[in-house]
Amino acid sequence: MGRDVLNFNVDWLYIPEDLNDAYKFDFDESNFEVVSLPHANKTFPHHYFKEEDYRFVSWYRKHFKVDERYKGKKVYIHFEGVITVAKVYVNGEFVGEHKGGYTPFEFDITEYIKYGNFENLIAVQVDSREHKDIPPEGHLVDYMLFGGIYRNVWLKILNDTHIKDVYFVVDKLQDSVAEISITTTIAGKEISNGKILTEVINKEGVVCSSVVTDIKEMQKEIVQQIKMDNPLTWHPDHPYLYNVSVKLIAENEILDNYTFKTGIRTVEFRDDGKFYINGEPLKLRGLNRHQTFPYVGGAMPDRVQRKDADILKYELGLNYVRTSHYPQAVSFLDRCDEIGLLVFEEIPGWQHIGDENWKNIAKENLKEMILRDRNHPCIFMWGVRINESLDDHDFYKEMNEIAHKLDRSRPTGGVRYLRDSEKLEDVFTYNDFIYNLEGKIQLPNHKKYMVTEYMGHMYPTKSYDNLNRLITHARLHALIQDKQYGIPNMAGASGWCAFDYNTTSAFGSGDNICYHGVCDIFRLPKFAAHFYRSQADPHLYGPYVFIASYLIPSFEEENGDKLLVFSNCEEVELYINDKFVKRQMPNRVDFPSLPHPPFEFSMKECGINYMEVRVNNASITAIGLIDGKEVARHTLRPYGKPHKLILSCDDNEIMADGADCTRVVVSVVDENGSILPYANIPVSFEIEGEGKLIGENPLTLEAGRGAVYVKSTRKPGEIILKAKSHYVAEESNVSIKTKSIGY
């Protein structure tokens, strides 16, 4: 069909050294190791390491053949992301350079390659040192960049005349009719009798709408209009995706077929302060996401990136995420499209604005981000301002102009921490921390306004902190979300942040982690995570109930008489063992505006004495009721001694490409199967079969849990991960299959 896009991730050679002649064809490769992409230039423990250790220059080399049938075509090498400066060579010749680690780039390598059995060579020098001239660096940055070719690489083979880009935009959605514009950009030689055929295809493969347009002489940009009756729309609660096929045809031959998935929807912020999708108001409830994973930074395969989107949507109950503070993986956004998670995407940066060269790179980053992602229905706003930077009128005026020129369908935002900052963007997006410890945020000072950060550094909380802190942390998140729901002219609010993340020595708790997440760095929930999950609609996402406590004798006075229960049910019943204690309605006194306020039981009124429950080996159960019927339950039991290790993997099968991996969560439980929240015990691992361990060995659990990752080799087979600890009698294991990728 005129277009082949080949995965280029396997069989790379890597060396963590800066070697002068490593781009040359006949360079000695005996000291290189074989790796697959995505790849981190160095792995680390999940905390206590030096950022300087990943700041070095490394080389990647790959030998490859190009089939004879591709002679006469254009060949491009496409990188999704390389931290931070990439210099690319093919067969010893310099091809090009890219600066910036969060946006894609590609080079035309047609003139450098040979065909048939010839072993071509691509060599990439990756400079992951600090670059003060490239965003986000130049001053302190509250996150780590890491290093390597940490995203996918593709080899694209196209006809000489091909489709360079397609821009799909819903201009109007009203009265069950969608008016759509499709702009197709053509590159290469001029053709005769050319046509563009665009088809919008539903999930059943039925063409719902199509249009054919003749290409005029010298025309490089073709704009087509489509009207669709009764389209299935994209919405967070029903994210329908269509397949779009754009064919370039000449002399009855298909020269190119550019395909992608997208949704039919409109987004806008109105002067009443509300956010609207498809003409209906929607309160935005979200968190911020860093792409940092333990051990490898951002260098995780598509499977793990997609899993993060699932966690945000289904385990945290969100309808929106902000990609702080840079564009994130395409696979993450693809999954957000599929599951209906709205995204506020922003350019790389953190507080600092550099010189004119620095600004020019930021402008290029913005262009690359928008051109890459403007067909994603999940994205509802572009972040065109450096996070928390001071005003720069001329710079930000141009950034807004760039965004509006490249995409007329979305508003711009720019995240700041000063209320009197100049508003050049369409929406005033503000990080509001001042009154967080009172459970409050400020009222909007602009018509179009949303809060993009709250909490975070104001009340950092570790998963293994004392019970009182975990409860207070969760309650503050609940109070602030309640406040934003009670402000009708506030579009929404996103807390800081979803997951704990690695940071530089200038920030965090001194161990290279910012404990600002509602989940830990392994994506395991703290109490606050359960609050967010409880806000999801029970009829769409399932009923939920969680007792935010531990069944231990000691208890701090601050929350001593309250048993906090998060639930999206109408009522909650409390039981001691099987004995009914009380049925409670949600607390709409302290939380009048939340969709699903927490439930709070007075333990004295309920006759609950923690010590007596503990001594009598009793249990506490919360049962969630809808329409008077049980739909969910959660039980707390007194904690015993470490009894067993439980291994749980996200995926039972991964691909044998040498990079695919899955998270394995390790939990220590007592005889009742309860996770022991203060059992911070060491666990050792052994791995057998076609797999490798990513993570610490031994790993010290935190709050009774932790995680490692199991990565495939290039051979299909079975992986057995074994775990043991001298605190428990028996070894535990989990099995993961690896499947051939076919080459």
From Swiss-Prot:
Identification of the protein by name: Beta-galactosidase
Active site: E388, E453
PROSITE patterns per record: GLYCOSYL_HYDROL_F2_1, GLYCOSYL_HYDROL_F2_2
Enzyme Commission designation: 3.2.1.23
Similarity comment text for this entry: Belongs to the glycosyl hydrolase 2 family.
PANTHER family: BETA-GALACTOSIDASE (PTHR42732), BETA-MANNOSIDASE (PTHR42732:SF1)
Subunit details: Homodimer.
InterPro entries from the UniProt entry: Beta-gal/glucu_dom_sf (IPR036156), DUF4982 (IPR032311), Galactose-bd-like_sf (IPR008979), GH2_Domain-Containing (IPR051913), Glyco_hydro2_dom5 (IPR040605), Glyco_hydro_2 (IPR006101), Glyco_hydro_2_AS (IPR023232), Glyco_hydro_2_cat (IPR006103)
Function statement: Beta-galactosidase.
Native source organism of the sequence: Thermoanaerobacter pseudethanolicus (strain ATCC 33223 / 39E)
Keywords: Glycosidase, Hydrolase
GO molecular function ontology, one term from the record: beta-galactosidase activity
Broad EC category: hydrolase
UniProt record, GO biological process: carbohydrate metabolic process
Catalytic reaction(s) noted: Hydrolysis of terminal non-reducing beta-D-galactose residues in beta-D-galactosides
